[in-house]
C-alpha cells in the first residue's frame, strides 16, 4: 500500500481504536454478564497497545486486518485439551531452568525467581524460602536521604524483645543491690506514677542492657519499662541512668517460689519492646542504580502487622512473596492476581493463557490448592486416580467403599475403551424420536437447504 504524499504518523483516536477492535463480538450462547467481562479483557489487551503507537492513517485498515488475523489464529479449537498444552509449556520451562542452575556459580543471592520460586508458587508453600515484604515510603518521605530514613524506622521495623537487648541477667535478693539505692529511688520518683518501696520485694532480676543495641534501635530504658508494665503491672521496674558505666535494669518480683519466678521471667523475656511481629531484618534498596528513591525490603513479617506503619509507608504499593499472607489478608481474588503476576515473572517465555489456566485450577475451590502429587489424587474417578500412582491401593479403596466410575475423565475413558469427551466427541447428536417414528426425518441429501459443491464439500444454501 502506497502512502499519500506528506502523510505523517500520528496517534490513533478513540473512534479509530474502537473501529480496529470491533471485530471482537460477544457470543450469543454465553450469559451476557460473563461474556461482556470476557470481551472487555480481550479488547483491553489490544487497546492498551494501540494507545501507545503512532501510525499512518492510510495503514489503519491494514492494521485492523492483521490484528484480526492474529486474533483468530490465537483462538484455541473447541474441545482442545488445553491442560496438557499448558503443562507441556510450563514443563519445558522448569526443565530448562533446572539445567540452567548448574551453570550459575556462587551461593544463593536471595533472588525471588528461578526453580525454587517456581516450586514455592505451585506448591503454595506456607513457609517460603524467601519471605520478603517490600515497603515503599509515602511521598512525604520519598526525597529524604538514607540517613534520615534510617532514623525514621530505627525502632519501628525489627521485632525486638527484652531478651535481645540484654547482655547478662541474674536473680538476686533485693538487699544485694543496696549500692544502687540512690539511683533506684531517683528512678522510681522520676518515672513511676505511684511511689513504692523496692525493699518490700524479696527478689530482683538484675539485667545488664547492651548500650550498642539501645542506640541502634533508638530505645531508652524508660520505653522498656513502660512496655513491660503493659504486660505485667504486678512487677515493679527501675533502671540506672544511661550515663552509668553499666546500664542496669531491675525487675522486682512479687513472688518467692522458684517456679513462679522462672515463669514470670520467661514471659517477660519474650515480650516485644518495639518493631513489627516476625520481622528479623530489613535492607534499604533502590529500584535501579540511578534512582534516588529508596524502599525497604524486610525478612519476615506479614501484611496485617504492617498496617500499623500506615503513617510512614504507602500500603497500596506494598509487595510480599508469601501467598498465604496475601490470601489471609485480601482474599482469593487478590491471590489469583498475585499468582498470575509472580508466575509471569518467573516464566517470562510462557504464554499468559497457560498461567491463568494453572491459577484457576489452584484457586477454583475458593482456597489455594497446591499442584502436588497429593492434590492430583483428589479426582472423583477411581480409574483417573489409579492411572496417576498407587493403582492397587486405589482399586482396593474404590472396591471397599463401592465407588462408581463415571467415565467422564480422559484417563478413565482411555482405560475403559470409551471415546473421550474431547475434540469432536464433546458434541452429542439429539434425535427427534417423534419425527423418527412418523418417518418425517430428512437426511442432508433430501434437505433443500444444503447442497454439495463440485469438490464434495457440503455447503449451506441461502
UniProtKB/Swiss-Prot annotation:
GO terms for molecular function: DNA binding; DNA-directed RNA polymerase activity. Disulfide bonds: none annotated. Pfam families: RNA_pol_Rpb1_5. It comes from the Viruses. GO terms for biological process: DNA-templated transcription. SUPFAM superfamilies: beta and beta-prime subunits of DNA dependent RNA-polymerase. It catalyses: RNA(n) + a ribonucleoside 5'-triphosphate = RNA(n+1) + diphosphate. GO terms for cellular component: DNA-directed RNA polymerase complex. Transmembrane segments: none annotated. Keywords: DNA-directed RNA polymerase, Nucleotidyltransferase, Transcription, Transferase. The keyword Nucleotidyltransferase applies. Its EC number is 2.7.7.6. Component of the DNA-dependent RNA polymerase that catalyzes the transcription in the cytoplasm of viral DNA into RNA using the four ribonucleoside triphosphates as substrates. Belongs to the RNA polymerase beta' chain family. PANTHER family: DNA-DIRECTED RNA POLYMERASE, DNA-DIRECTED RNA POLYMERASE III SUBUNIT RPC1. This is Probable DNA-directed RNA polymerase subunit 343L.
Amino acid at each position: 500500500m502506497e502512502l499519500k504524499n506528506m502523510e505523517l504518523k500520528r496517534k490513533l483516536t478513540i473512534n479509530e481504536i474502537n473501529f480496529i477492535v470491533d471485530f471482537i463480538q460477544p457470543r450469543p450462547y454465553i450469559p451476557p454478564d460473563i461474556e461482556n467481562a470476557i470481551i472487555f479483557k480481550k479488547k483491553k489487551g489490544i487497546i492498551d497497545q494501540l494507545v501507545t503507537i503512532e501510525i499512518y492513517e492510510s495503514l489503519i485498515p491494514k492494521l485492523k486486518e492483521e490484528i484480526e488475523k492474529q486474533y483468530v489464529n490465537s483462538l484455541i479449537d473447541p474441545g482442545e485439551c488445553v491442560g496438557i498444552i499448558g503443562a507441556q509449556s510450563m514443563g519445558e520451562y522448569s526443565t530448562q531452568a533446572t539445567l540452567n542452575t548448574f551453570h550459575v556459580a556462587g551461593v544463593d543471592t536471595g533472588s525471588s525467581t528461578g526453580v525454587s520460586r517456581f516450586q514455592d508458587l505451585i506448591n503454595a508453600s506456607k513457609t517460603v524460602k524467601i519471605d520478603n515484604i517490600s515497603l515503599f515510603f509515602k511521598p512525604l518521605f520519598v526525597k529524604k536521604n538514607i540517613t534520615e530514613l534510617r532514623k525514621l524506622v530505627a525502632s519501628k521495623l525489627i521485632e525486638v524483645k527484652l531478651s535481645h537487648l540484654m547482655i547478662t541477667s541474674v536473680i538476686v535478693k533485693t538487699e544485694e543491690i543496696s549500692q544502687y539505692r540512690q539511683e533506684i529511688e531517683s528512678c522510681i520518683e522520676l518515672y513511676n506514677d505511684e511511689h513504692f518501696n523496692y525493699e518490700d520485694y524479696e527478689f530482683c532480676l538484675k539485667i545488664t542492657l547492651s548500650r550498642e543495641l539501645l542506640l541502634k534501635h533508638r530505645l531508652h530504658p524508660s520505653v522498656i519499662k513502660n512496655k513491660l508494665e503493659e504486660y505485667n503491672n504486678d512487677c515493679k521496674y527501675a533502671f540506672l541512668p544511661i550515663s552509668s558505666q553499666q546500664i542496669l535494669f531491675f525487675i522486682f518480683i512479687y513472688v518467692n517460689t522458684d517456679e513462679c519466678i522462672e515463669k514470670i521471667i520467661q514471659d517477660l523475656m519474650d515480650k516485644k519492646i518495639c518493631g513489627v511481629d516476625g520481622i528479623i531484618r530489613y535492607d534499604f534498596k533502590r529500584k535501579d542504580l540511578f534512582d534516588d528513591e529508596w524502599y525497604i525490603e524486610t525478612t519476615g513479617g506479614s501484611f496485617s502487622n504492617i498496617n500499623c506503619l500506615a503513617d510512614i509507608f504507602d500500603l497500596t504499593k506494598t509487595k510480599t512473596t508469601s501467598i498465604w499472607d496475601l490470601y489471609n489478608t485480601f482474599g482469593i481474588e487478590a491471590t489469583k492476581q498475585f499468582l498470575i503476576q509472580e508466575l509471569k515473572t518467573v516464566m517470562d517465555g510462557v504464554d499468559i493463557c497457560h498461567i491463568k489456566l494453572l491459577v484457576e485450577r489452584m484457586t477454583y475451590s475458593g482456597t489455594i490448592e497446591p499442584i502436588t502429587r497429593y492434590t492430583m489424587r483428589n479426582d472423583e474417578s477411581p480409574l483417573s486416580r489409579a492411572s496417576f500412582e498407587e493403582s492397587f491401593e486405589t482399586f482396593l479403596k474404590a472396591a471397599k467403599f463401592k465407588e462408581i466410575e463415571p467415565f467422564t475423565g480422559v484417563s478413565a475413558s482411555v482405560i475403559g475403551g470409551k471415546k473421550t469427551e474431547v475434540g469432536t466427541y464433546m458434541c452429542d447428536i439429539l434425535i427427534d424420536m417423534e419425527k423418527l417414528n412418523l418417518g418425517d426425518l430428512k437426511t442432508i441429501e433430501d434437505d433443500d437447504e444444503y447442497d454439495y459443491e463440485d469438490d464434495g464439500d457440503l455447503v449451506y444454501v441461502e
